[in-house]
Curated annotation (Swiss-Prot):
Organism, as annotated: Oryza sativa subsp. japonica
Pathway of action: Lipid metabolism; oxylipin biosynthesis
Biological process (GO), any one: response to ozone
Function text: Involved in the biosynthesis of jasmonate (JA) and perhaps in biosynthesis or metabolism of other oxylipin signaling moleclules. In vitro, reduces cis(+)-12-oxophytodienoic acid (cis(+)-OPDA) and cis(-)-OPDA to cis(+)-OPC-8:0 and cis(-)-OPC-8:0, respectively. May be required for the spatial and temporal regulation of JA levels during dehiscence of anthers, promoting the stomium degeneration program. Involved in carbohydrate transport underlying normal lodicule function during anthesis.
Protein name: 12-oxophytodienoate reductase 7
Residue positions binding FMN: 35-37, 110, 241, 324, 345-346
UniProt xrefs under Pfam families: Oxidored_FMN
Length: 394
């Protein structure tokens, strides 16, 4: 059994483990479960395995963010990802949310649409995926197919400007469904090369209409989605995630700081009208959505730090960071004021009691990458041991 070190009491008082007041919710600590695709919602409907998985990772007054949950039938780009666009899915999520609330957790639903990061096999009637562009994702990247193999990303269909309001409405309705399911709020996934990021980044967005070209135009879709969701459920239940300096799925921008600042300034203006958002969630440049750590994708570590601190210093509200954080980096980020909250992904996969392990500075279970995206409801999902339990045999 792992034993806590002598400085256990001092670590319990560290800022990472101190309470935090969000606009609507009070947290008991600053360690957040990051949104992570796990491919266990068979047929797009969350089942008992998801309820157990999230409940295992719940602490009293802790914030959890669900895996990416698609807002329409055209939204998926992985097998067995959950949706929240119909009544069956909404009702199924209620049981998962109830399991989290029963343990005192605060639960946000991440609203997701992958855009061009999909394949005809995931699309209604085998249609081409939709995007801001008709450029496909390069052969550098591969898509996970339903049979577990990997394939090439196909050429997407460029959305007409007249089609975009329908997608905005899908986000709005999904947010309403999330609140009906009992979620405490939602996070708009505007990061990691998915559909909103496909409008934000000038390396993808080659449009010449009101949704392309200038920074203002490239930010338009995100702002329309955010305003629609805020009008439906209230600003203090709405969060936004961005990753201006990450080129995952070819989502490259020529000036990440300028892009990040453009988003932040517009969110600040929105907050002046609608009230404070729940938080802004920014992924550190060293992270990619496939779990790789790549420091310096867009420059030196100093430049990456400058980006995060610039956004932190400009955004008027709760600032959450993520991307390859260790316990020590999380302690430092909160203590230095670089972030209010820190979200953890892979470490939470293999350590359902991560918050307690961090408090005690206890040892951590190692995650098994090959089980990240498998449909097994137990192995690599709910069978990682808690402190004091025998080690997993995986």
């Amino acid at each position: 059994m792992d034993r806590p070190p002598p400085d256990q009491q001092r670590q319990k008082q560290a800022p990472l483990f101190s309470p935090y007041q969000m606009p609507r919710f009070r947290l008991n600590h600053r360690v957040v479960l990051a949104p992570m695709t796990r491919c266990r919602a068979i047929g797009g409907v969350p089942g008992p395995a998801l309820a157990e998985y999230y409940a295992q990772r719940t602490t009293q007054g802790g914030l959890l963010i669900s895996e990416g949950t698609v807002v329409s039938p055209a939204g998926p780009g992985f097998p067995h990802v959950p949706g929240i666009y119909n009544q069956e899915q909404t009702d199924a999520w209620k049981k998962v949310v109830d399991a989290v609330h029963a343990k005192g957790g605060i639960f946000f639903c991440q609203l997701w649409h992958v855009g061009r990061a999909s394949h005809q096999v995931y699309q209604p009637n085998g249609a081409a995926p939709i995007s801001s562009t008709d450029k496909p994702i390069s052969a550098r990247w591969r898509i996970l197919m339903p049979d577990g193999s990997y394939g090439k990303y196909p050429k997407p269909r460029r959305l007409a400007a007249s089609e975009i309001p329908e997608i905005v409405e899908q986000y709005r309705q999904a947010a309403i469904n999330a609140i009906e399911a009992g979620f405490d709020g939602i996070e708009i996934h505007g990061a990691h090369g998915y559909i909103i990021d496909q409008f934000l980044k000038d390396g993808i967005n080659d449009r010449t209409d009101e949704y392309g070209g200038s920074l203002s135009n490239r930010c338009r879709f995100l702002l329309e989605v955010t305003r629609a969701v805020v009008s439906a459920i209230g600003a203090d239940r709405v969060a936004v995630r961005i990753s201006p300096a990450i080129d995952h799925l070819d989502a490259y921008d020529s000036d990440p700081i300028k892009l990040g600042m453009a988003v932040v300034e517009r969110l600040n203006a929105l907050q002046q009208q609608s009230g404070r958002l729940a938080y802004l969630h920014v992924t550190q440049p060293r992270y990619t959505a496939y779990g790789q750590t790549e420091s310096g994708q867009h420059g030196s570590a100093e430049e990456e730090s400058r980006l995060m601190r610039t956004l932190r210093g400009t955004y008027q509200g709760t600032f959450m960071c993520s991307g390859g954080y260790t316990r020590e980096l999380g302690l430092e980020a909160v203590e230095s004021g670089d972030a209010d909250l820190v979200s953890y992904g892979r470490l939470f996969i293999s350590n359902p009691d991560l918050v307690e392990r961090f408090r005690l500075n206890a040892g951590l279970n190692k995650y098994v990458r090959k089980t990240f995206y498998t449909p097994d409801p137990v192995v690599g999902y709910t069978d990682y041991p808690f402190l004091g339990q025998p080690k997993s045999r995986m």
